[in-house]
Amino acid sequence: MRLIPLNTAEQVGKWAARHIVNRINAFKPTADRPFVLGLPTGGTPLTAYKALVEMHKAGEVSFKHVVTFNMDEYVGLPKEHPESYYSFMHRNFFDHVDIPAENINLLNGNAPDIDAECRQYEEKIRSYGKIHLFMGGVGNDGHIAFNEPASSLASRTRIKTLTHDTRVANSRFFDGDVNQVPKYALTVGVGTLLDAEEVMILVLGHQKAQALQAAVEGNVNHMWTISCLQLHPKAVVVCDEPATMELKVKTLKYFNELEAENIKGL
């Protein structure tokens, strides 16, 4: 596992965006051989999306031959609702870059057959071979996507009941009213994430410090979904300084020295 320790949330977003752009450009995608990118929602990736849009407008990257799969979607929330992940992605990213509409894949939380929707999502991912890079965030309790504590590390795309803590955390997007936050969501599984060629998780803020400590210094544990990254051959965690407060000094020193060339100039 790589840990990229930076100072600010803005630096995390810019580093992540640059990494994505470098991966896409090195891949040299075509219509017949697209780059497959997994994407998250929430507050954490906003700086990364902003940086990606800026780099696209500067002519540094095209998303014309990029196929995207989003991590999750609320169940029962109309896709036109401002807090649906469909709306979030179009508002913050898709509407500002040159990605074709047919290359965008989002789970349908209003599908008449939820199980079939989840099964077809997995099948579509497999039809591309694999996701080349999956970017994600993490919850205070260590969940990735909506794989809440005690999720199977072999799980696939499915419906999940959201914990009260997750709904409270997300209520900031619903005028602070937890009762407006859906109780269920569709989410890719831990196994889906682990199948990706590379997984990059962004960790911001002191409230995520315990989750980061569990990922880097703890044991693999289904109560801390983020710890599954230890099983992945190409996992990258990018964090700001407040998120490192639970790490041992020697751990942080080790990764600072290891990644010195990759964080220089930020």
Curated annotation (Swiss-Prot):
Keywords, alphabetical: Allosteric enzyme, Carbohydrate metabolism, Hydrolase
Active site annotation, chain numbering: D72 (proton acceptor), D141 (for ring-opening step), H143 (proton acceptor), E148 (for ring-opening step)
Metabolic or biological pathway: Amino-sugar metabolism; N-acetylneuraminate degradation; D-fructose 6-phosphate from N-acetylneuraminate: step 5/5
Domain of life, per lineage: Bacteria
EC number: 3.5.99.6
Entry-linked Pfam families: Glucosamine_iso
GO biological process: carbohydrate metabolic process; glucosamine catabolic process; N-acetylglucosamine catabolic process; N-acetylneuraminate catabolic process
Record's GO cellular component terms: cytoplasm
Residues the UniProt record annotates as site (Part of the allosteric site): S151, R158, K160, T161, Y254
Database matches in InterPro entries: Glc/Gal-6P_isomerase, Glucosamine6P_isomerase, Glucosamine6P_isomerase_CS, NagB/RpiA_transferase-like
Catalytic activity: alpha-D-glucosamine 6-phosphate + H2O = beta-D-fructose 6-phosphate + NH4(+)
GO MF annotations, alphabetized: glucosamine-6-phosphate deaminase activity; identical protein binding
Quaternary structure note: Homohexamer.
Family: Belongs to the glucosamine/galactosamine-6-phosphate isomerase family. NagB subfamily.
Biological role: Catalyzes the reversible isomerization-deamination of glucosamine 6-phosphate (GlcN6P) to form fructose 6-phosphate (Fru6P) and ammonium ion.
Name by which UniProt lists this protein: Glucosamine-6-phosphate deaminase
